């Protein structure tokens, strides 16, 4: 019977296959758009994280694959080979940190072939930054810099200009990304995947996933950009992924093989496409053919895409083509559709009811501060590199630029990487700093060179710097001064206006005085180092350097430095051999703070009592505002069996809040002096703070020390501070967008949909990079921060900041590691302690913007301090002790910031100027500003000025000619008139509120005077 059945099967098989042969099939994949059909744009891509579970280099070479089998080198090798095989295939690439690594390893012959692929459009660079930066935790200057670095590489090597923004993975999207990192780069469109699940559901219903996004109220319609949100994630529809180990069924089109399924797979494709058509406008849809670290064996993808294009087009119901986001954008524009207008931003982001991705606004606060500190340092170092003259053979800022660029990645500064990856980012930053530190020292030595060229040439000054000043460690200032020697302190100001600011350095002796370069004694203040400060200093110097401090600093010396714009001043610290007059008066309160203590002069007071610290500002005789400061911690949720969502590196899910009260025998140390008063307060064994008020200033500075956060009880803790007032704020507050624009927030409200509130705390948290403020009819309270943090106003008249986090559970978002930072010493490891500052000012309504904008610049760009010793007055008498790059008495207007002054490799100089104020923000400063380039570069002759896009990769005029003007539903508002083109004779730059202008400048060769010494400087 079995033989008969088998014979029958052979007969039937012969009938089925009879006349059919297996042969080569030439797939027709020639791209075309068919107006009368649904056009499906297939976009092959690989999303390559510049560090996350593995380090950037491990991801590139494919090492440490026990964590994840990912090798970007294989992706690029494989993709390029596949593109060369078929001219119809296309691929987009985004992360230049990886492509740059791959590019420098290629032969000249391979480079020629790749350039042809780029020129033909087969390989297109999208976004084009070194990484796909985060949008919540970076400062806008860092976002500009990292993108510029990638764009310069693309322009230099390929002569190309990216057209599309591609922020597919960041966890929420900022207004600054839309208008500044989009429209101002000359991008025609911006695409991403992650928006709030409630927002997505509404947009799917209403076909509003694609919009015109107007991110700036100040720049209006001139800064709009077409924006597309993907219907699902940034991967293909289910059943269409084709990496080697993926489970999607391939098209099997050989009739001699089993499982022939062409029509079945064509039907699957058509069904998925028609489903997407139902949620978007026009007859064009885009499929993302790829996801994380795909195309390691690119043939497995391209073979299937070839087949789908061939057979679906042959079927005739749809038109399918290899495409790119640029081609897709052009097709959308050609459709002449009107699009909804989107304003504000896409924060906060939640992917489930109890999963708000707002914890990462604060995660890894020490790393966030390190990035911010080095960002400000890099800005100053580039200026000094320009003033000295770029020397490619010596130390440069290039390594720091690269490390900072990578650190802006959405799993880097965000704090959402694994611990060993965080250490790798920090190491790269440290190595970059060491190179930039040498550059800064040599530049200051050059600029302060001998006053007279006729004098005997001095050897270059060896300047020392102190990167650990934040923990009161500075070998240069702590060293005991031998007889006849003194310490020269050179203070550099990277801002465009004069600064008078208190400088603080640790010293070992109390017998010191401070003089300016003319020999005039300067008012100073000498403070004892607290026990807490000494403990932190000793522990963390040992942790960082592997050894304890050699010297024992006993005091902090503070004096006011007066520094010209884009220049330096010099001061001299000497040991007099007798007790200094500047020793601060200090005393300690006893008992349990049962008596009221008041500190401060003028109209700003600090009051301490059993209730805590109160900051009071007298705005007038009848208007007094008091803000009471306190600490608390949220208990991070561990999740439940029903809903396992826990608080973690990404997600903030609180499960209650507990106040942190001062211990019963808490003491206050009050320090008073001629420059400032401060109060030291130890709340418990792991939280202490210093509250400081400066003479002549209207803000309070709160310096906090938090850690190690106790973990023995198994409770996740998220540490917050609150400022509570009686202001009637009606649920309204304002937070910055990447340190630039301020956006109005209303508690439990979203502009674009009716919010269903499941997490009333986490769902009202927003990212802060500059600060947060609230106001009512009588007053305005502003808080500025020194790094990226999360913040909110959860009750009327109250502001809170999240400062530190230590978790006990992972939040199931892929990192697979608990956020539990520790510091390790030979005697063991313990939780990380962080130090930081925030600043509080109370103003009349509408008056706070001036302080937020100008003081915010001082926070971002602290004074740069360098030290050298001298014998007698030898250095002061033989060097230039003060310097400004500007024409004497000239400074930038207070509403303009100098963002970038950088000499490029080709000798051109990149200059960025930014208006700091928004429209209507301040009656005095929200107006057009003018900058005179001749006075900025008064000792150089400007030969040519060319205005460019924000990244400097194309002329502004050409960019504007190509700009797509989209139709908007309803009113798009008036287009804002920007500053006039720079006249070649007058050389005046005009800036309207929130405008940033980028210029490439060429100078004539000339003899210029630097430090009264002639220098031939070719620029």
UniProtKB/Swiss-Prot annotation:
Signal peptide annotation: 1-22
Cofactor note: Binds 1 zinc ion per subunit.
Catalytic activity: Hydrolysis of terminal, non-reducing alpha-D-mannose residues in alpha-D-mannosides
CDD domains, sorted: GH38N_AMII_LAM_like
EC number, UniProt record: 3.2.1.24
Needed co-factor(s): Zn(2+)
Keyword Hydrolase: yes
Pfam families noted in UniProt: Alpha-mann_mid, Glyco_hydro38C2, Glyco_hydro_38C, Glyco_hydro_38N, Laman-like_dom
GO molecular function: alpha-mannosidase activity; carbohydrate binding; metal ion binding
Quaternary structure and interacting proteins, as annotated: Homodimer.
Family assignment from sequence similarity: Belongs to the glycosyl hydrolase 38 family.
Known function: Liberates mannose from p-nitrophenyl-alpha-D-mannoside in vitro.
Protein name: Alpha-mannosidase At3g26720
Species of origin: Arabidopsis thaliana (Mouse-ear cress)
């Amino acid at each position: 019977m079995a033989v008969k059945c088998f014979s029958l099967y052979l007969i039937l098989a012969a009938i089925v296959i009879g006349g059919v042969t297996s042969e080569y099939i030439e797939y027709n994949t020639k791209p075309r758009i068919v107006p009368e059909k649904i056009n499906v744009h297939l976009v092959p891509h690989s999303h390559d994280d510049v560090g996350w579970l593995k380090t950037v280099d491990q991801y590139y070479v494919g090492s440490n694959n026990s964590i994840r089998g990912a090798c970007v080198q294989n992706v690029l090798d494989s993709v390029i080979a596949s593109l060369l095989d078929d001219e119809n295939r296309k691929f987009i690439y985004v992360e230049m940190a990886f492509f740059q690594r791959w590019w420098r390893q290629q032969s000249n012959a391979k480079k020629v072939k790749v350039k042809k692929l780029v020129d033909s459009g087969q390989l297109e660079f999208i976004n084009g930054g070194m990484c796909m930066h985060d949008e919540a935790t970076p400062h806008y200057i860092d976002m500009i810099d990292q993108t510029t670095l990638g764009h310069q590489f693309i322009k230099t090597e390929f002569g190309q200009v990216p057209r599309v923004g591609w922020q597919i993975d960041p966890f929420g999207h900022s207004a600054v990304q839309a208008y500044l990192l989009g429209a101002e780069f000359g991008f025609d469109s911006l695409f991403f995947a992650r928006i709030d699940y409630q927002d997505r559901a509404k947009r799917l219903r209403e076909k509003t996933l694609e919009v015109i996004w107007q991110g700036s109220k100040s720049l209006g319609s001139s800064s709009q950009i077409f924006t597309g949100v993907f219907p699902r994630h940034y991967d293909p529809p289910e059943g269409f992924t084709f990496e080697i180990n993926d489970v999607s069924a391939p098209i099997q089109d050989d009739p001699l093989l089993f499982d022939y399924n062409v029509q079945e797979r064509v039907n699957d494709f058509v069904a998925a496409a028609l489903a997407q058509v139902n949620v978007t406008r026009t007859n064009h849809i885009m499929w993302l053919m790829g996801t994380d670290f795909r195309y390691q064996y690119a043939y497995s993808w391209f073979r299937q895409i070839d087949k789908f294009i061939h057979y679906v087009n042959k079927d005739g119901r749809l038109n399918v083509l290899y495409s790119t986001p640029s081609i897709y954008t052009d097709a959308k524009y050609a459709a002449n559709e009107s699009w909804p207008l989107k304003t504000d931003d896409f924060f906060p982001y939640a992917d489930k009811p109890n999963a708000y991705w707002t914890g990462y606004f604060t995660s890894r606060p020490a790393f966030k501060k390190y990035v911010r500190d080095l960002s400000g340092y890099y800005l100053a170092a580039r200026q000094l590199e320009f003033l000295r003259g770029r020397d490619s053979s010596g130390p440069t800022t290039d390594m720091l630029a690269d490390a900072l660029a990578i650190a802006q990645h959405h799993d880097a500064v965000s704090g959402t990487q694994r611990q060993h990856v965080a250490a790798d980012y920090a190491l790269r930053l440290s190595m970059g700093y060491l190179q930039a530190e040498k550059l800064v020292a040599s530049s200051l030595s050059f600029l302060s060179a001998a006053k007279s060229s006729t004098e005997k040439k001095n050897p270059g000054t060896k300047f020392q710097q102190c990167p650990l000043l934040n923990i009161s460690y500075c070998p240069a200032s702590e060293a005991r001064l031998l007889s006849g020697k003194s310490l020269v302190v050179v203070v550099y100001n990277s801002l465009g206006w004069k600064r008078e600011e208190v400088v603080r350095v640790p010293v070992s002796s109390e017998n010191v005085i401070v003089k300016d370069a003319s020999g005039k004694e300067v008012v100073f203040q000498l403070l004892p180092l607290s026990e807490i400060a000494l403990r932190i200093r000793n522990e963390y110097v040992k942790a960082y350097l592997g050894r304890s401090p050699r010297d024992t600093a006993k005091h902090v010396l503070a004096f006011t430095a007066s520094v010209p714009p884009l220049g330096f001043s010099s001061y001299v610290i000497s040991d007099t051999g007798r007790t200094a007059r500047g020793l601060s008066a200090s005393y300690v309160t006893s008992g349990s703070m049962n008596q009221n203590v008041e500190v401060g002069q003028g109209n700003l007071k600090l009051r301490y009592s059993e209730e805590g610290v109160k900051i009071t500002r007298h705005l007038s005789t009848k208007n007094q505002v008091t803000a009471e400061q306190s600490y608390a911690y949220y208990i991070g949720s561990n999740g439940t069996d029903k809903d396992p969502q826990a608080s973690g590196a990404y997600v903030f899910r609180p499960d209650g809040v507990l106040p942190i009260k001062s211990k019963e025998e808490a003491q206050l140390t009050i320090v008073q002096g001629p420059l400032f008063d401060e109060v030291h307060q130890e709340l418990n064994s792991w939280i202490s703070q210093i509250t400081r008020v400066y003479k002549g200033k209207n803000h309070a500075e709160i310096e906090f020390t938090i850690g190690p956060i106790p973990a023995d009880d198994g409770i996740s803790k998220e540490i917050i501070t609150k400022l509570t007032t009686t202001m009637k704020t009606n649920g309204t507050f304002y937070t910055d967008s990447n340190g630039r624009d301020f956006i109005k927030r209303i508690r439990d409200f979203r502009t674009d949909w009716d919010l269903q509130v499941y997490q009333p705390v986490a769902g009202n948290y927003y990212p802060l990079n500059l600060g947060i403020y609230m106001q009512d009819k009588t007053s305005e309270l502003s808080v500025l921060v020194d790094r990226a943090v999360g913040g909110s106003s959860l009750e009327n008249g109250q502001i809170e900041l999240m400062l530190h986090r230590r978790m006990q559970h992972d939040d199931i978002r892929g990192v697979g590691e608990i956020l539990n930072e520790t510091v390790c010493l030979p005697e063991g490891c313990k939780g990380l302690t962080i130090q930081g500052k925030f600043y509080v000012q109370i103003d009349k309504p509408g008056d706070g913007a001036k302080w937020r904008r100008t003081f915010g610049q001082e926070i971002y760009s602290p004074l740069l301090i360098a030290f050298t010793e001298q014998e007698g007055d030898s250095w002061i008498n033989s060097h230039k002790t003060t310097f400004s790059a500007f024409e004497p008495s000239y400074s930038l207007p207070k509403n303009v910031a100098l963002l970038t002054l950088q000499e490029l490799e080709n000798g051109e100089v990149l200059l960025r100027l930014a208006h700091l104020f928004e429209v209507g923000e301040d009656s005095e400063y929200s107006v057009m500003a003018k900058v005179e380039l001749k006075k900025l570069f008064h000792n150089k002759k400007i030969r040519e000025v060319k205005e460019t896009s924000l990244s400097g990769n194309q002329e502004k005029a050409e960019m504007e000619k190509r700009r797509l003007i989209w139709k908007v539903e309803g009113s798009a508002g008036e287009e804002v008139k920007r500053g006039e083109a720079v006249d070649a004779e007058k050389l005046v730059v005009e800036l309207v509120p929130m405008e940033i202008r980028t210029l490439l400048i060429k100078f004539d060769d000339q003899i210029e005077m630097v430090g009264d010494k002639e220098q031939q400087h070719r620029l």
